[in-house]
C-alpha cells in the first residue's frame, strides 16, 4: 500500500530505502537476512545477523502476530544491554519485509496515537472511488497526520487512502549523524480495518512488558474555546520528564506542541509579558482614538461657532444697509 505524498513529511529530507535499524541482533535489511525477527516474525535463514556473539546478547521476551488482509504483522518485545524495545515487522504477500524499532516509551506514545487515528477513521465517511482511472495514480493528501521525534529517530504517521482503501502509513527514519551517510528509513502500512486489532495487541505487550513505574501525580488537563478553535492543555510524563502538550483543534485541523516542564515558567512569563505589552498598546490606541475624536468634536464645534458668527455678522450688515 505504498503511497507517494505524506502530510507529516512535507518539507522533510528525502529518505533512503531499506536499511537496518541499529539494535543489536537486527537483520541487515528488509530482505531475507538475519536474526533480528522474533517469534513468527523472525526473518529467513542465513546470513545478515549480528557478527560474533552480539546476537546472543539480545533476548526475546514475547511475540504476537496480527493478520490483516493479505499481510502479517509481528510485534516482538526484546531486551538487550540498553533496555527493552519493540520490533514491528510487516510481511507482505510476496514475502517482502519492513521493520520498525521503538523503545518501550515510544511504543506507549505510539499506542496512544493509534487510538487517535482509530477515532478519526471511525468518523470518516465512505471512501470515494476515483472517477477516472488516472486518478488512481494521483497522490492524495493525508486524511490525518502525526509525528514523533525521539533522539535520532523520527516517526511519521499518515492516515491515507488509495484505490485499495484506507491505511495508516508509518515511516521511521534514523539519522546516523554527520559523515555517516544519508538518513535511513523503513515504512509499514497498516490497513485501516485492522487498526483496532493491532492497537490491542500492542497494548497487551506494553501492559505485560512495559517498564513498570509508579504513575506520576500530574495535574488534570483542561481546555478553552476561542471562536471556532479549541485549545487543549494536557500534562504528561515520560522518561525525559514532565511535559505539557498544547493542542489547537479546529473542525478540519489539528496541531500540537510539547513544552517541557522546565520552561513552563519562562513560557508563562513570556505570555504575561506580551499580554501586558498588548494591553499598553491597546490602551495607547484607545487614548489616541479618544484624542482624535475629541479633536474632531472641537473642530466641528469651532466650525459651527464660526458658521453661527458668520450668519450673525451677515444679519447685522443687512440690518445696517436697511
From Swiss-Prot:
Database matches in InterPro entries: PUR-bd_fam (IPR006628)
Alphabetic keyword roster: Acetylation, Activator, Disease variant, DNA-binding, Intellectual disability, Nucleus, Phosphoprotein, Repeat, Transcription, Transcription regulation
Gly residues bias spans: 9-52
PUR repeat III repeats mapped onto the chain: 215-281
Stated name of the protein: Transcriptional activator protein Pur-alpha
Modified residues (N-acetylalanine): 2
SMART domains per record: PUR (SM00712)
PUR repeat I repeat copies, ranges: 60-125
Example of a GO cellular component annotation carried by this entry: neuronal cell body
Family: Belongs to the PUR DNA-binding protein family.
GO biological process: dendritic transport of messenger ribonucleoprotein complex; DNA replication initiation; epithelial cell proliferation; lymphocyte proliferation; negative regulation of transcription by RNA polymerase II; nervous system development; positive regulation of cell population proliferation; regulation of transcription by RNA polymerase II
PUR repeat II repeat locations: 142-213
Gene name of the record: PURA
Compartments where found: Nucleus
